[in-house]
Every structure is written in C-alpha cells, then in structure tokens.
Amino acid sequence: MQTPATSLLIRNAHVLTLDDDDREWECADIAIEEGRIVAIGPDAGARHGKPFERTLDATGLLAMPGLVNAHFHSPGNLMKGSLPGYPLEVFMLYEVPPLADGGDSSRLAYVRTMVGALEMLRRGITSVHDDAYHVPVATRESIDAIMRAYADAGIRATVAIDQPNIVEYDKYPYLAALLSDDERFAMDKAPRQTTEELLALYAYLIERWHGADNGRLSAAVSCSAPQRVTPDYFAGLSELSKRHDLPFNIHILETKVQRVLGNEKFGKSLVRYVHDLGLLDERMMVIHAIWLDDDDIGLLADAGCTVAHNPVCNLRLGSGVMPYYKLRAAGVPICLGTDEMNTDDTVNLWFVAKTASLLQTLATRNYREWPEPQEMLAALTRGGARAMRRAHDLGRLAPGCVADIALLDLDTVAFTPLNDLRRQLVLCEDGGSVRYTIVDGRIVYENGRINGVDEAALRRELRELAGGYREQLSRAAAEARRLEPHYRSMYLRAAAEDVGMNRWLA
C-alpha cells in the first residue's frame, strides 16, 4: 500500500474548484493535512499556520478535482484492440465465453488491474468504480488480487463483484430455442455460483477491504444486470447495499435486445421490472440506460438513481445514443465512464467527455440545448462522486473534501492560446497536460513517473503473461465462432422488433 499522507501545500496554482459556487482563482494555494483539504485560497498556506512536509510550486499549473471514472471493468485490461466491432451480445460471447472453464491466475489479475490503474493516474483520473467480473467464477484470491493492485497503485477505487448466476441462454430472448439440446446441456453444466456463495464473497470483500487505506478502497455491489441474476440474489444484493450504504451497479437497457428481452420475459421494461421488485433506489448507478422510454426515465428520477454514460463504448458496440436530454430534463444525475479497455480500448476519460458532448449535437436541432462544458466537467467529477456515495467529500476542491487533485500544465498545445478554460478542458485536453496526480493527499504521479512503482518491469511482466492469456482467448474464440450464428440470429430478430422507439441513427 501507499505510505500515509501527512501534509502538503500546493502554492501559486490556477485553481478551478468545481464546487457549489464554481469558484476559480488565477493564483491560490491549497493546504492539505492527513489526506484532506484544510484551506484553499490566495493565502491558504499562511492561514494554515503549520509547517508542511512538502511544498509544491504550481506556478503555471491548473489545479482541479481529479477525474472519476464512474464505470470500468478491470478484467478487460488485457484486451485493448483485441476484438472487432460487434454488438454487445456477440461481443460478450467472445469476451466472456459461456463455456469457459479455465480461470485467470491471481498474479495476472493483479498485474492487469495495476496497469490499468497506472494509466488512469497518468491522465489525472484519481478514482475508479470497477465492476469487476471473474471468469469463470469469483474467488477470494481473485478479489484480493484486484484490491491489492489498487492499494499498491495509489488510486481511489470502489469495487464490486459482477457475477451473473443464471444460465447463459436465459439472459437473452429467443436464444434457448436457437440452440441444440447439446448446446443447452453444455451451458447448463457451465460453472455458476449460488446466491449463498456469492453473498459470502461479498461479506469477505466488505470485511476485508471496505474502508481500507484511510477509506481509499471501498466496496460496491453489482447484479451485472437484472436479467442475469436470480431474484433472491438480486434482493440479497439490495439488502447489502442498504445495510452498508454501498453503490449498486446495474446495467439496464444497454441494447435493443435487452428491451425486447424485458417485454418477452417479464412483460415490461427492465427498469419497470426492477421497480416492481421494490429494488430501484438512490444507491443504484444505472449503466448505459440507452433504450429507455419516458416511463423508465420517470422511475429513475423518482428513485434518485444516477446514470453512468459510456458514449465511446456505446459507439464501439453500436448500442445506440442515450437519451441525454430527457434524462437531464427529468433531473437524473449523470456521470461518465470509459467502460472496459476492450470496448473503449483506452481509459481516456477526457475523450469520453468530448465524445459525450459532441454526440448530443446529433440528438436535437435546438443548439441552445447542446451540453455546456460545465455539464461535462460536473459529470467527470461530481457525478462520479455521487455514484460512489461520496458526494459530500469527493469531486470538488473545498475544505473538508479529500485531496484528490489533478495538476495540469497550462503551457501546452491544449491551452495555447487560453480562450475558455472549461471549454478547452472538455474539447482540447487529452490527459497529456497532466503533470501531477494527487490521491488522498499523496502525490502518486509526478512529471512522467508513478511514485513507488517500476512501470517498465510491470509492463514486461504483463507482456509475458499476455502470451498465455491470448492462447486461452484463442481456444475460447473457436467455441464462440461455433455459437455465433445463434447469437447473430437472436440479435437480428430482436433488432427487427418494434419497441416504440429508436436509439440508433440509422
């Protein structure tokens, strides 16, 4: 784990707080003590009245809240650029093969998680909300590997166990009828964990890691998606979320196939299904939320849910365009995520914000409604903080908040000339201007290096481990190719259904 933070003074920074008053100073100090901001302003250092362990001269640098990657799957970190463009249902067939039998080693899980965390820190991303899946089953060892990686990297991480527990063909419409008896039998026999086994793993995650390292590491819960779990497991997760005030990750209506599934299996939308179970609440971060109707949006707003928008992933998989304006009008808070490295192929949250902003210009001709830079900056920071149940002390620079800060060089091409700081942060910055990343008051990245980590050695090890991983994927891909015609038929049939809306541009 990283060494404990003591005290740090950031001097002479251009400060963008993104607080309730959106305060900005062209030259100010930020005083940090025991991982939290204690004073901010032109004379914050003098007002503190104590010596600092370190003073950082930030002349020419912008200090802003660290970015929050609100939706991520670390197990995809080895798969950047590995798969062609497929719709989600076909994509997942290759990504998480339903008949997979071999698991990843704990060392592989550690290294791939670590590499992703370091890439985020280099871009000024100080927090990640990791919906970590485990193939074929979750174990204490795989949970520990992921959490230790985040502990050692120095990033703030909230982590869930994303583990479906129903048979593969029941997750989709029409698929059971398309498969042969032998194929269904093989899926029936595939490893699958019980409600009791999964809740026991959650108990371990919470007891061992929730609140660790001064609260930098924490637990969330995840059902993956409502159609992928049994009702008793779903209810058990909801109870855990309420008892410990944990975020609840839930993918809902990411694709048209899922809209059709809700109608076919439950006779209602998946949002209405969750609501009718009595499980829709303010702890839920609803991921993707593309194929929503007006009733769904009203239910999300009434429940106080947050929506995680992943526009690059949505484009990569052809899932559709999220109804941003309707969600905004209903008052649904929005945060931004990269999703995983095989559906975004990077962890560049700056590019996600730019894509989210520009994509919505195609959704309305009323240009006065187009997203303003301030909306995207809020989604990059405070929106993700809310989804992580940290709205009170994360995502803004203010006394009492955790000291999660990105320092960007204003003498770069992104800000030359400096015409509009907020607009250029959203439209010009790509993470290349980040010079320092501070998490919990600790400088974890400075001037091109992650403190305390031999990145070159880590990358070498990752390349060595990736060879065996690619062989494993190659074997799985052969089975996936055999099943793909069934998934394609299912996808095309669902795509042709009239669901009363269209979220595609075509």
Regions found by a protein language model. Give the residues of each.
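His/Asp/Glu-enriched, well-ordered alpha-helical/loop segment
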Residues: 276-283, 325-412, 428
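Alpha-helical scaffold segments that flank or form the walls of functional sites
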Residues: 80-131, 136-156, 198-214, 463, ...
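Active-site gating loops and adjacent loop-to-helix segments of metal-dependent hydrolytic enzymes
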Residues: 78-109, 166-192, 256-283, 306, ...
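Metal-coordinating catalytic core of metallo-dependent amide/deamination hydrolases
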Residues: 141-289
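Glycine-enriched alpha-helix->loop->beta-strand junction motifs that scaffold or abut catalytic
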Residues: 238-247, 279-282, 299-308, 329-334
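Divalent metal-coordination and catalytic microenvironments
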Residues: 13, 30, 35, 60, ...
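Active-site microenvironment of metallo-dependent hydrolases
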Residues: 1-28, 33-38, 380-506
